[in-house]
């Protein structure tokens, strides 16, 4: 039997708009007395919600059933949508309601917007977000970094100032224990380092490995930052929690940077300090084949006769690990010392 339209005078009212968000629209409709649910379900009125395709201007069914409410989800923010209600009687007659138009709301400001503003170095957007008061300034991103950490790491000094003026905690640490000061020191952003220090950042903070900001600055190799840090009073011979390495030891292990090593030694770093295995900065420089740093350490008082806790010295280490250039340097140094002793006699 062919379905018949309900008389136009019996057209249903358009769906009523309920709660609207940036991604959803709630629609509901009232049952008239004649459409009360009595008897088996096949004797009930059935409802369909149809949504208009804005390009084709055709309607597609997004819900059909016996409920009197439906929430349309997965919508775009600030977008106009058009819906109509289709009511089908138990006998198969049907009618469409007038169309209802409704727009989704603006996407609410979230922590993602905060971090996006910092990532693109957008001062105006950052200020608007913070002044809106809907986002906590210290909420971390998916990597565990606060907005201040990201700004400090990238050297966005003006953003750092904005964030601090809005109450960010300069001493918060990420998942590995690094704070904004460590990140700025490693990246070499001296202006940021100075500003963080003026606003309470501490040289005494340790990451999960026990490293200080100076350890990270030594890895970064930015001499202007290291020089200022030393002048500002950070501890030159702080040891980490794992290998008990000082910043000078990290230079020997990581970069071999002579300028950084010289700055640290000039500031009083112990050239003969030992780590948990009894290794000195000289031994570590030999093992990592940092020839020029080996020369510098020897010139600055490193003791080549020291043995580690396994009884091994720098010459033996150079031979075992085939550090030929370093070995030649050490042997020549030893010969000169022998000749000097002989001439004294």
Swiss-Prot record:
The fibronectin type-III domain mediates interaction with COPS5 and RYBP. GO terms for biological process: positive regulation of DNA-binding transcription factor activity; positive regulation of DNA-templated transcription. It comes from Bos taurus (Bovine). Gene3D superfamilies: Ankyrin repeat-containing domain, Immunoglobulins. Coiled coil: none annotated. Polyubiquitinated. Polyubiquitination leads to proteasomal degradation. This is Fibronectin type 3 and ankyrin repeat domains protein 1. It is found in: Nucleus; Cytoplasm, Cytosol; Cytoplasm, Cytoskeleton, Cilium basal body; Cell projection, Cilium. Through the activation of JUN and AP-1-mediated transcription, may regulate apoptosis.
């Amino acid at each position: 039997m062919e379905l018949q339209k309900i008389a136009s005078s019996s057209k249903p009212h358009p769906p009523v708009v309920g709660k609207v968000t940036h991604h959803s629209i709630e629609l509901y409709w009232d049952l008239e007395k004649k459409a009360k649910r009595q008897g088996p379900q096949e004797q009930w009125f059935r409802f369909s919600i149809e949504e208009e395709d804005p390009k084709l201007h055709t309607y597609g069914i997004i819900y059909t059933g016996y409920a009197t409410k439906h929430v349309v989800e997965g919508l775009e923010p600030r977008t106009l949508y058009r819906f109509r209600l289709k009511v089908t009687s138990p006998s198969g007659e049907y009618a469409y309601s007038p169309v209802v138009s409704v727009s989704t709301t603006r996407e609410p400001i979230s922590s993602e917007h905060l971090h996006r503003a910092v990532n693109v170095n957008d001062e105006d957007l950052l200020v608007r977000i913070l002044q809106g008061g809907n986002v906590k300034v210290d909420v971390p991103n998916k990597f565990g970094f606060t907005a201040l950490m990201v700004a400090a790491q990238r050297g966005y000094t003006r953003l750092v100032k904005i964030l601090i003026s809005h109450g960010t905690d300069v001493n918060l640490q990420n998942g590995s224990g690094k704070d904004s000061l460590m990140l700025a020191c490693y990246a070499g952003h001296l202006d940021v380092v100075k500003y963080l220090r003026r606003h309470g950042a501490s040289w005494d903070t340790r990451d999960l490995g026990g490293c200080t900001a100076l350890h990270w600055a030594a890895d970064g190799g930015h001499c202007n930052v290291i020089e200022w840090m030393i002048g500002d009073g950070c501890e030159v011979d702080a040891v980490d929690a794992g290998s008990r390495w000082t910043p000078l030891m990290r230079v020997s292990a990581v970069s071999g940077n002579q300028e950084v090593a010289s700055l640290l030694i000039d500031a009083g770093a112990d050239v003969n300090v030992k780590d948990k295995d009894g290794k000195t900065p000289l031994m570590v420089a030999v093992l990592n084949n940092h020839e020029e740093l080996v020369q510098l350490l020897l010139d600055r008082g490193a003791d080549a006769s020291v043995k580690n806790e396994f009884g091994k010295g720098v010459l033996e280490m150079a031979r075992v690990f085939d550090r030929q250039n370093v070995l030649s340097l050490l042997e020549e140094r030893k010969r000169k010392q022998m000749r000097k002793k002989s001439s004294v006699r």
